[in-house]
């Protein structure tokens, strides 16, 4: 045992504070003493983030760390520093016992110290025993290989008997059970993480050790060795890790003991062929790039010994049982050479850390380049729940983050799944609504679709009539076909409903859902309002679109007569995705800039001001700038904008307002936006005093482009210097 560890365990602590009386051996000691004063422990010590906590983490594993019943009163005092002593300055990376010896600062007795010393000595002795056992195993393996080589040479000298057949049974199950028992015994002897990492278990070592003790020949074929190596992550598949044994047909032992034979899982008879001349390192030096569902017979044809010896050509049946504890779905290798085993060697339950091992794809096939082509089928419930949670966390559009959250889908798959999901959800909500809950827009869209179908059918009918008239003189067959098509189209037109919308009463639109043809609809060439030639139909279709937009539940505004339709403010519905991009008419969270009421049809923006100041400025501007001659409402800005945007044929476009020569109203402007907006540069600069220099506004020289200074000019209006913004630049401060 090292001397430094013994000195650390037997040396007393530098700190005089006795922390946590032992519940095991010293129950009479008080729970906490710090020179009789609890306030002597420094305040504000965050032991979770301190280096001393991570350095002396081993002391938390001690049995002396448990408090007795008297220590429950100490939890109320949050200033206690349990781990503030010198022993926690030890580094956790030295050894486990260096950090474990920090228990010397606690209230330890001589019995505890002796127990720790004996525990450490037993651990060191156990390590020496393990090393000796490993050396003995290696020596026994060498001796066994030499004996097997001699026996094989003797058998080669004997004459080949054609009718002799020997069967060998692999005892992998018994060997794995013995290996598991030895792992349990070794794990019970160790009680710390570092101890467990010192003792490394290899399944091949246990296989050879068991075979050496029981004198049982184990045929370590590439399949069984690779399956055993899949349990051990520390060893890659290489010829060094696969124990090369001798002739697999040999069941006789040198000592004459009978081998222990386990039940055969699946007996398969394969003829033994002479091994190929290629060395064993060529197929196994690389990671297992071909799946295990490849033909089995060539794998057994590969040499299983390091010596270049040839087997007999006699067909001897070999019974091989391949067992993988982590895979119950492994189909045993058969002589069908069938590559289409779906459940063949899909290592989904293996806890392997190397991702370069063979990954079988659909049908048990892999690309020759080694790239995995995962063909994933439908979405599971778990994936869909993770998809919905990812949307709630990251939001729509963050497909990469949601893909990382789901874990089994690519961002493109998640995007397509989201599109399908929202379309299906929209269709379900539309089907749930009754006809009374449908908005007027939906009803009008249905009617427009029907009228558009009628127009398209009528155009097709006219084209067919022209074609039939041209070809009637030359070809009679084509004319008869055209007449038949005309008759069928006329019958379709009679069955489809037609509607004459009421133009003067848009709130009370009555849709005609009659499917039976009427007398007025029987003549196909009558001047119906749905025909494209009449100007009334064009105007009616325009008014239908206008009425549909004005009377949708997101607008609720008509041509100016508020008596027909109840006016609902837009902020009541809180819809920020309307067709007009006018989120919240009342100026709340309005990020669209179109200052001083420029009545522009092409701009969907209303207001260039941020929060509630825009509401004030909008009404101020609408009072200052008189509206054009026939405005329906003179003080509501969005009504005027709606009429100019959606009703271009009702009201003429107003001329641009003349420049205002009077002062703007004096009140604080917080976002520095332009009231008059000379050039119309709508940069949407809301609540930002520094980015609107290019906004066509000659800004006040106070706090120009200074992001760190206090916003002094917010206390004053923009026209603090009493100047006309159209005449001259403001005076500069000296």
Swiss-Prot record:
What Gene3D superfamilies does this protein's entry cite?
A: Homeodomain-like
UniProt xrefs under Pfam families: Myb_DNA-binding (PF00249)
Q: Which GO terms describe its cellular component?
A: nucleus
- Write down the superkingdom of origin: Eukaryota
What are the entry keywords? DNA-binding, Nucleus, Transcription, Transcription regulation
Which locations, inside or outside the cell, does it occupy?
Nucleus
Q: What is its main location?
A: nucleus
What GO annotations for molecular function exist for this entry?
DNA binding
List all Low complexity biased stretches.
164-173, 221-230, 258-372, 445-454, 489-543, 574-615
Residues annotated as region Disordered? 1-35, 128-196, 221-378, 445-623
Q: Where is the composition biased (Polar residues)?
A: 174-196, 231-257
Q: What's an example Gene Ontology biological process for this entry?
A: regulation of DNA-templated transcription
> Compositional bias of type Basic residues: which residue ranges?
469-478
Q: Where is the HTH myb-type domain?
A: 371-426
Biased segments, Basic and acidic residues type: 131-142, 455-468
Where is the DNA-binding region?
Answer: 399-422
Among NCBIfam families, the record links this protein to: myb_SHAQKYF
User: Know the name of this protein?
Assistant: Myb-like protein J
Give the organism, scientific name.
Dictyostelium discoideum (Social amoeba)
